[in-house]
């Protein structure tokens, strides 16, 4: 099998996990391609002698499977690079939460064995696409988790006029607005009171950030509907954050958000169940009185 490896470049203390991964793949005779930036970090900064049959930049690669070793942020970066290639992504968690990257370092060896035995499942995760005339946002307009519209450099709220399929929904007076996929519903959206949505739902969550109203609540819509946003701000600009990567926009920029025409394939072990992950990672339903 041919693997493309992505990893973060700051977790020096957890370098042994990366070394273990490469040894496991080499043991199976895998063809290993490594993101050049990650390879440089391993070789130059950590002095690890890892096998790499090829190095690649940006999205200039092909593979049977992508492995992301790091946290959920590393997984999101890998997903951005994979784009519409249709390559499944396996996430190994060396970060904190690990909701997307949910294979622990202790499970690595067993998981790689399962990959070679074709004993795993692949989940299709929907992606959001942002359409606008801002050239900076056009470089990477896709989000696996969320697209967030936020105020910038001001204590004043922004006004976000929101339409669904051309029909006016409301004008949010708030610090921002989060448009999230089911995958992203357990990320930024959850932290501001958004709903938890099971990954396979064909829906999009719209959640305001600190709205100046008691009558505004999150809303869930069909994922084949189109969202149009017009923003007004006293500073005449605002932030757009796509899976955490942000750019400044002028308030004259109209934003259109819809489901992308491709999905991200996420590799899951058979016994990794979404509701189990909710309980163990998010402490869902935990009661200290019991």
UniProtKB/Swiss-Prot annotation:
It comes from the Bacteria. It catalyses: NAD(+) + ATP = ADP + NADP(+) + H(+). It is found in: Cytoplasm. Its EC number is 2.7.1.23. SUPFAM superfamilies: NAD kinase/diacylglycerol kinase-like (SSF111331). Pfam families: NAD_kinase (PF01513), NAD_kinase_C (PF20143). The keyword ATP-binding applies. The active site is at 72 (proton acceptor). One of its GO terms (cellular component) is cytoplasm. NAD(+) binds at residues 72-73, 77, 145-146, 175, 186-191, 210. Its cofactor is a divalent metal cation. GO terms for biological process: NAD metabolic process; NADP biosynthetic process. Keywords: ATP-binding, Cytoplasm, Kinase, NAD, NADP, Nucleotide-binding, Transferase. GO terms for molecular function: ATP binding; metal ion binding; NAD binding; NAD+ kinase activity. PANTHER family: NAD KINASE (PTHR20275:SF0). Involved in the regulation of the intracellular balance of NAD and NADP, and is a key enzyme in the biosynthesis of NADP. Catalyzes specifically the phosphorylation on 2'-hydroxyl of the adenosine moiety of NAD to yield NADP. Belongs to the NAD kinase family. This is NAD kinase. The gene is nadK.
């Amino acid at each position: 099998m041919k693997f493309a490896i992505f990893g973060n470049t700051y977790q020096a203390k957890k370098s042994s996990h990366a070394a273990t991964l490469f040894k496991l793949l080499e043991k199976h005779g895998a063809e290993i391609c490594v993101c050049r930036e990650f390879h440089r970090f391993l070789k130059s900064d950590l002095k690890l002698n890892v096998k790499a049959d090829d190095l690649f930049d940006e999205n200039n690669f092909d593979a049977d499977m992508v492995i992301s070793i790091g946290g959920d942020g590393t997984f999101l970066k890998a997903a951005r690079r994979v784009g519409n290639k249709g390559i499944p992504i396996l996430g190994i968690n060396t970060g904190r939460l690990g909701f997307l990257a949910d294979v622990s370092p202790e499970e690595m060896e067993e998981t790689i064995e399962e990959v070679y035995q074709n004993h795993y499942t692949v989940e299709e995760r929907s992606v959001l696409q942002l359409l606008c005339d801002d050239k900076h946002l056009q470089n990477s307009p896709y989000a696996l988790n969320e697209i967030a519209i936020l105020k910038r450099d001001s204590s004043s709220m922004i006004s976000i006029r929101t339409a669904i399929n051309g029909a006016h929904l409301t004008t949010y007076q708030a610090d921002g607005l989060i448009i999230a996929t089911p995958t992203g519903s357990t990320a930024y959206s959850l932290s501001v009171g958004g709903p938890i949505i099971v990954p396979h739902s064909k829906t999009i969550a719209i959640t305001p950030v600190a709205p100046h109203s008691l009558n505004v609540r999150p809303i869930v819509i069909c994922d084949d509907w189109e969202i149009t946003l017009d923003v007004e701000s006293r500073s005449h600009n605002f932030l757009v954050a796509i899976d955490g990567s942000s750019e400044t926009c002028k308030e004259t920029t109209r934003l259109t958000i819809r489901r992308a025409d491709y999905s991200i394939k996420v590799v899951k072990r058979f016994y990794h169940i979404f509701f189990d992950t909710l309980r163990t990672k998010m402490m869902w339903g935990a009661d200290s009185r019991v």
